[in-house]
């Protein structure tokens, strides 16, 4: 017998939609208002800078031809499927894990859309200190990192007792 979806972690899928809207909206604004390589200072140590990433994090495999586009798309789809299954198997009350999974799925889907639609991922956040610049990234990357950090954090938190779970 199947369980009602609202009692599962899938109840948190609305957060995937929020992440997607914010991520794709920010990328749309960059594509409409910036030429490749344009930079606008926001705050000291933070710029908006339009860059294209043909690889993965830190432009990993960016210069490997075109096969990595499909490789990373396959990884994103696989991760999304696994996390959706994990959300379905978890209770809606397991908030931290479900929020983490939703953030990762939303970020992965945002970058997957870019990869499939444009052939590259749109990056725009440039953090720097002095002359040192961190790799340019986007809001999808931020959601993925926050989700991963929440999963690690959850591993350090005390587990609820059987009484608290009931």
From Swiss-Prot:
Q: Does the keyword Protease apply?
A: yes
Per the record, what are the reactions this protein catalyses?
Answer: Release of signal peptides from bacterial membrane prolipoproteins. Hydrolyzes -Xaa-Yaa-Zaa-|-(S,diacylglyceryl)Cys-, in which Xaa is hydrophobic (preferably Leu), and Yaa (Ala or Ser) and Zaa (Gly or Ala) have small, neutral side chains
The pathway where this protein functions is:
Protein modification; lipoprotein biosynthesis (signal peptide cleavage)
Record protein name field: Lipoprotein signal peptidase
> Which residues are responsible for catalysis?
123, 141
The free-text function statement in the UniProt record for this protein reads: This protein specifically catalyzes the removal of signal peptides from prolipoproteins.
Q: Which UniProt keywords apply?
A: Aspartyl protease, Cell inner membrane, Cell membrane, Hydrolase, Membrane, Protease, Transmembrane, Transmembrane helix
The UniProt similarity line reads: Belongs to the peptidase A8 family.
State the superkingdom: Bacteria
Which major enzyme category is it?
hydrolase
Documented EC number(s) = 3.4.23.36
The places in or outside the cell where this protein is found are: Cell inner membrane
What GO biological process, any one, is recorded here?
Answer: proteolysis
């Amino acid at each position: 017998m199947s369980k009602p979806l609202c009692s599962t972690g899938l109840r948190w899928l609305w957060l995937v939609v929020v992440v997607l809207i914010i991520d794709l909206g920010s990328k749309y604004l960059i594509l409409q208002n910036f030429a490749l390589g344009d930079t606008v200072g926001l705050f000291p140590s933070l710029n908006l800078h339009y860059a294209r990433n043909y690889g993965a994090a830190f432009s990993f495999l960016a210069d490997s031809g075109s096969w990595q586009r499909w490789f990373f798309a396959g990884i994103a789809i696989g991760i999304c499927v696994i996390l959706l299954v994990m959300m379905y198997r978890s209770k809606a009350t397991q908030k931290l894990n479900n929020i983490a999974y939703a953030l990762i799925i939303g970020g992965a889907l945002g970058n997957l859309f870019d990869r499939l639609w444009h052939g590259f991922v749109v990056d725009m956040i440039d953090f720097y200190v002095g002359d040192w610049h961190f790799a340019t990234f986007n809001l999808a990357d931020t959601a993925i990192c926050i989700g991963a950090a929440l999963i690690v954090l959850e591993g350090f938190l005390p587990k609820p007792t059987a009484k608290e779970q009931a």
